Amino acid sequence: MKKLWIVGLILVFVWAACGKKAEEKAEEAAPVLPGVTAGMMSTLTQFGSALDKKDFAAAYSSLRAVLQDFWGLSPLLLQNVRFVKNENNTFGIYEPRETEEYAPGDAIYLYMEPVGYASKKSESGKYEIGFSADMSIENDKGEVLGGQKDFAKMAFSSWNFGTEMCLTFTYTVSGLEKGRYKIVTTVRDAGSDKTATCEKWFSII
């Protein structure tokens, strides 16, 4: 009887040790991606599974879902800020201006691509997006020469959760002497409390 008890104790010990090793292996196998939420990780797993099955439509949908989650986490960002030749632009389709020099009275067109804005679904089923903006002009000493709050307000709607959005602001300034100046533009997201500011230098010749 004593011998059986010893064998039983050894079996229990081995079983417990195996269980512990299995738990350690499970912990080691768990992917570690700092900042990635559980929901995003689940969707990324779905993406990988769909890709492995060559179900590219499902994989694309999963990627879009991750991007939508990222959009909610991200602050408002202003990407690809540049001077362009006119105000008629769409996302990624514009004519870059080769120079940042302007004659007095020239219209200045500034293109940018916002990221992380709110996109809220309305009762109609459309996603509603909106922005407002303030602007100011500074000289090379940092002195504010003028500006305007809410100089632009824009609203958009789409049947899809849109992530390819561009804004083009038109600035008409007068009374500036020859020299170097800075346009400071603050964009506010209408659907949240997110804001972002960009600065762009130009010269009057």
Task: Enumerate the predicted regions with their spans.
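Bacterial signal peptide processing site
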Residues: 19-21
